[in-house]
A protein has these predicted regions:
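Membrane-interface loop-to-helix entry segments
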Residues: 108, 128-178, 211, 234-238, ...
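Membrane-interface "cap" regions at the ends of multi-pass membrane proteins
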Residues: 1-37, 50-54, 66, 186-187, ...
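Terminal cytosolic tails of multi-pass membrane transporters
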Residues: 1-4, 381-403, 424-528
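TM-loop-TM module centered on a large, flexible mid-protein loop between adjacent transmembrane helices
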Residues: 71-74, 78, 110-115, 233-306, ...
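Helix-loop-helix connectors at the membrane interface of multi-pass transporters/channels
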Residues: 74, 101-131, 165, 222-226, ...
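Helix-loop-helix junctions that connect adjacent transmembrane segments
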Residues: 1, 39, 117-128, 156-290
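Transmembrane helix-loop boundary segments of multi-pass membrane transporters
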Residues: 28-39, 100-103, 112-126, 149-158, ...
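Hydrophobic transmembrane alpha-helices that form the core helical bundles
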Residues: 29-33, 41, 50-137, 141-145, ...
Length: 528
């Protein structure tokens, strides 16, 4: 594999993937759900996701290949679990450019009439808006077609811009339009309690904005010495973006006018709210900043969508490791780019643009599907320590078993907070994906040896999440007592976590697969 990325470039990619449309909309929707207490949601989410990221730091340095994410569940639980988790990961990555494109469209609706319709803070594209979104999605394909080196050079320039503009926005709004009374009036600091904070994390775009750290793991095979740099890149990018988003939330809450809050934070409304920060800048008389933010409203989500388009193509091209897929998916052009996978992902993104509506709805759904796919990381960390105890680990996580369980619990509550509306879609897509996978395996006569027994834990997990979500307090029936639902989810997570570890494949299976894989990649690191 060509080593075309430096560690610094990968750090830029990680930051870029977490500073996209989330910074343009996350503060608005988080304040809508939690009021001023939304400022707590960002550092809390960053801390919770750190437990998940630490699990991937150890795993990533064990298997520093770009296709390692696709292989983890195959190593630990066999083919069926790997098919499910890898398909969900790929699906989530493939449609992430859709929400970044939606960010571009919603901001643009303030100066291009007729591309969106909306009711309150909920938006959907018109036919013209949909056609514009297709143009943006196609441009991702064209840019990525010319290779990872070009991608890195473009992305580095984007990242510098994406750090400067949000920082300038925070300083300008606090300096020119700051109302400290906003934090304690209109219902107080926590008008909707802790439930509002938890809703803000999943449905308000907080978790979604910070979930991009895993792009590092997917692309780490493109850099030299991943064992040295991956943990630092993961922790550093997560810390930086958490601080940046917290500052943005602070400036947003403090700069909203009294007139916009007459009906409370849940009914927050002001002129031009489709582009919230640009609108606040204009209302404060900073037209120059408003214009700059409209420019950034294209650059930030566009560059993030470019990152996701790249990583999703790499993910799809490596899925033949876990399920028999058409060989054409792995076909690369002279720039070593899986161009067929880019095209397939474009078709999926174009389809999902018709199914999902508006940035807020998209972010909640993506949190649900990504958190489920992230849950395999903490489980794999514990399983692989039992299956491959002597395998070389350039970074070994201290207290790994406890941190892994906390990370798994974070994934569980993240799905629950996303709400029943999102979990219901997740369930439908998972079932459809399983049916299609089984049909394909039967057609190719590869359905034997699917390791169905080792996948039962995931069926229990998905069914349990659906039940909790249906009876829960986030779009469900509100039957579960508030806060007791989190305790029940803790016990449920402990049960599933233990079941998943007990369901792991024998060590001989794991050693054989890893040996075969690293031999193929020329990186045989098994200790004798």
């Amino acid at each position: 594999m060509n080593k075309n990325l430096s560690a610094l470039s990968l750090l830029w990619i990680s930051i870029t993937s977490m500073v996209g449309s989330g910074w343009l909309f996350g503060s608005l929707y988080s304040a809508h759900f939690a009021g001023p207490a939304a400022i707590i949601a960002w550092p809390l989410a960053g801390l919770l996701l750190l437990f998940v990221a630490l699990s991937y730091a150890e795993l990533g340095t064990m298997f520093p290949q770009s296709d390692s994410l696709a292989c983890l569940p195959l190593y630990t639980h066999g083919r069926l679990t790997s098919v499910i988790m890898s398909s969900m990961t790929w699906f989530g990555l493939a449609i992430l450019p859709v929400i970044e494109t939606q960010g571009v469209i919603q901001y643009a609706s303030n100066y291009i009439p007729g591309i969106v319709t909306h009711f309150g803070v909920y938006y959907r594209n018109t036919p013209l808006g949909y056609m514009l979104s297709l143009v943006v999605l196609m441009s991702f394909v064209l840019l990525n077609y010319f290779g990872i080196g070009l991608f890195a050079r473009i992305n580095a320039a984007f990242t510098v811009w994406k750090i400067i503009i949000p920082t300038l926005t925070v300083v300008s709004l606090i300096t020119m339009s700051y109302h400290p009374e906003n934090f304690f009036q209109y219902g107080g600091f926590m008008p909707y309690g802790w439930q509002g904070i938890m809703a803000a994390m999943s449905s308000g775009g907080v978790l979604f904005s910070l979930l991009g750290f895993r792009q590092v793991i997917i692309m780490m095979g493109e850099i030299k010495k991943p064992g040295k740099y991956i943990p630092l890149i993961l922790a550093g990018s997560l810390l930086f973006t958490t601080l940046l988003y917290t500052g943005l939330q602070w400036s947003f809450i403090g700069s909203v006018s009294e007139q916009a809050l007459t009906k409370g934070w849940v009914n927050l409304s002001f002129t031009g709210e489709a582009g919230p920060f640009a609108a606040l800048a204009a209302l404060a008389g900073m037209v120059w900043l408003s214009v700059l933010l409209y420019v950034d409203a294209f650059i930030s989500p566009y560059s993030t969508g470019l990152v996701y388009s790249t990583t999703a193509a790499h993910m799809l091209s490596s899925m033949d490791l876990v399920i028999q897929t058409p060989q054409v998916f792995a076909k690369r052009n002279k720039y070593q780019v899986p161009w067929v996978s880019l095209g397939v992902n474009f078709l999926l993104a174009a389809t999902m643009s018709l199914v999902l509506h508006g940035w807020q709805e998209m972010s909640a759904f993506l949190v649900a599907i990504l958190m489920v796919s992230y849950s395999i990381g903490p489980i794999a960390l514990v399983c692989l320590r039992k299956q491959l105890p002597n395998y070389q680990r350039p970074f070994r996580l201290q207290g790994g078993n406890l941190i892994a369980f906390i990370g798994f619990y974070v994934c569980t509550v993240g799905v629950y907070w996303a709400g029943f509306h999102s979990v219901r879609k997740l369930l439908v897509i998972t079932v459809l994906g399983l049916v299609c996978s089984f049909l394909y395996c039967f057609i190719k006569n590869t359905h034997r040896g699917l390791d169905s027994k080792q996948a039962l834990w995931f069926i229990v997990y998905l069914f349990g999440l659906s039940v909790f979500s249906y009876f829960g307090n986030y779009g469900g029936k509100h039957i579960l007592p508030q806060y007791w639902d989190l305790l029940a989810l803790l016990l449920f997570s402990l049960f599933v976590f233990g079941l998943a570890i007990l369901s792991r494949k024998p060590s001989t299976h794991t050693r054989r697969l890893v040996a075969e894989h690293v031999q193929q990649t020329g990186k045989n690191e098994l200790t004798k």
